[in-house]
Every structure is written in C-alpha cells, then in structure tokens.
Amino acid sequence: MRKILKALSLPICAMLLLSACASSLNLRPGPFRSEMQDVFVQQTTLAVPASHAEHGEDYVIEWQDPVMEQHVRKWLDRPKGDIYHSDVWDYQRVTINSGTGVGDLIVKDAPDGVDIGGNVSSNEQLAACAVSVEGTYDPVTSLADLRHFDSLQVLYINNKMGASPITDLTGLEECKNLMLLSVPSVESSAFPTFAKLDSVVELKYGSDGIRADSNVSDLSALAQMKSLKMLWITGSEVDLTQLAGADLRVLRLDVTRIGSLEALKQMGNLSLLQLNNGQEIDSFAPLAESSVQYLSMSLSQGAQETYKDMDYTPLTQMPQLIWLNLTNNITFDTETCKKLLANDTALKYLNISYTPAAKDAEELDTAHLKEFTAPAP
C-alpha cells in the first residue's frame, strides 16, 4: 500500500531530515527503517559468504612493514618471536584502525556461507568468530604483508585524519578471495595494483567523509578491475571518463566536483547512482540517457543550495527510474515534480522532503507510488 509521510510533529521531521544523510551510511535493512530506505540499503549492500582458502607450505613471515607487524603481534598477543603463515592464513575479515582511537576487528574460522561483510553485532554466528583488539599504532602505509593472508575476503583500512597515502598495495594481489576492500587515500604510483585485484566486487576508496584527504587524480586503473560492481569514491574532483569502461552496478560519489556526467551513458549496467551531499556538476542531461534506476541526490542542510541553478528536467526523462531521493533540493518545483510523476510509470519510491514541490504535495498524483515522503520546508 502507498505510504504518504508528512510533517506531523517535530520529532518526525527530525527523523526525516536525518534520513537525508542516512543513505551515506552502510546500514542493513531493519525494523526501524522505511521501505524506501530498506530498498536503498539492499541495493548497496554486498553479501560476502565466508569461505576457506587452500593453504600452501607453512613458513616464517618476513615482515616488510613494521606497522603491519605491530598490528598482527597485537592480535596474536605475541610481542616477540616468529610469526608463521599458519598464524594468519585463516583470517577472513580484517579491519585495521591506525590512530583512529578504535580497535582492530578480526574475523577467522567463520562457518562457510555466513555473511562476513555484515554487521557483527547483529549476527550471532559472525560475532562468535570476531575479536576486537585495542592498540596504538602509526598509520599503515603498506599492504604488502597481506600477501600471507590466504583466506582474506573483507578488508577495511582506516588511518587517522591527515595521514600519508598508502604507498604499496601489492600484497592484495595474492588475496585471491578478497571481495570487499575499503582503503583510504593511495599514492598515484600504487594505483596500477588495483587493476590486478580480479576478485574485488566492492571498493570503497578514500578517507570516509574527508574529501580533501583522498588522491583521485587518476582512477583509470579502477575501470580495469574485472569483478568490480560497486564503487564508492570520496575525494575532490573526479573525472568520470576515467571510469567509462567499468562494468559498475553501483556508483556512489562523495566528491567536490564531477563536472560532466557524460560517461554514465557508457555504463550500460549502472543501476544505482548516489551523488552524496552535492557536487559541482555541469548538467543533469546525461542522466536521461543513462540506465540508472535508483538515484540519490539528497543534500544536507548545509549543501542545499548546491544545485540551485540546475535544470531538473532530465530527471523526468529517465524511463527506468524506480527510486528517487531529492531531499533538500531547494529548486525542485511542483511543475517539474508533476512532469516526473506523469512521465515515469516505473517510479515507485519518491522523497521530495524540504523541496518547494513538497509544499504542494496534495496536488501531486502519487497513486502509483509505493512510498512518497514530502514534509514541506
């Protein structure tokens, strides 16, 4: 049944305002989220079934990076002595936090099939295999030593704000089961390694929420990743033509400037696009010729004037569009919204919270929508 949500009280309005930012969170579907939010989360969440790799001979690890060695010694509670290949070859998920004030998270020996990419606290089987380890470390700059982690499927690297970029990704080439990779800024000289990561399905690149800290000067190596379907980039100015050959299903951009969206027309399988908290964009026109079905253009209050001079007409010309969030787009008007609803029979989920069109919500024909959210400014 169609749901119509309006500003009935201050608490509800506050919750809806927070929903403008919720799409930037990696949250699983749950009982406290709307159907529209659940749909978005389902489209942007990668399941990583646990598996175990075959191991070769055992040997003493000769460490290349002392910071990585410090992390592993802390995990093993082994401040001195040799560390063997067999000590690390069953690690399936690793979160390394350096200088962030948060402990590392390690998952090993998870039963085959358990989703190790999910939220540990909400999965008993996963939680039983997870360990959090506190420690104080310098930022990680090399991932070369991860070549010894045969079973690694999920890897998150988080360095403190302002840390130097990672200089070496070569160890990841040997992680043949790696599916989900999240890394902060990487030096340009290390980017070619991305093209060799054939098993990675989801890549989160850049310091989370800190655009200026991420090197995005040349992303062409990402377009050569054979299995890559889901890409989230945080950075400054991004040239999408460098990604034109990528076979992406999901593209999420938290960047300062994109410029042209023309490259989207060459991504025939791209179904979800998130423009997170506003970017400088030349025109929305290429969206009309894209394959995008799920489009998030929600803005925070601080960024609500980002698209004030843009023409939203191309959004009314997207025949495959199913899901659209325009929260805080302060120049999306009633006339354009009426065109959108009249022309797009595929559209099922629409959020126009805090837009001019929301003031005239009663005039809009939303009968075909599954969910319509429109608290007025």
Residue ranges and their predicted role:
Residues A7-L16:
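Sec-dependent N-terminal signal peptides
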Residues T44-D82:
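Surface-exposed cap/linker segments adjacent to membranes
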Residues L27-F40:
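Ser/Thr/Pro/Gly-rich low-complexity linker/stalk segments immediately outside membranes or between
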Residues R93-T141, S151-T167, G171, N177-A190, ...:
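Concave beta-strand-loop units of leucine-rich repeat
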Residues A22-L25:
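Bacterial signal peptide processing site
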Residues M1-A7:
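Positively charged n-region of N-terminal signal peptides that target proteins for export
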Residues L18-A20:
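C-terminal motif of bacterial Sec signal peptides marking the signal peptidase cleavage site
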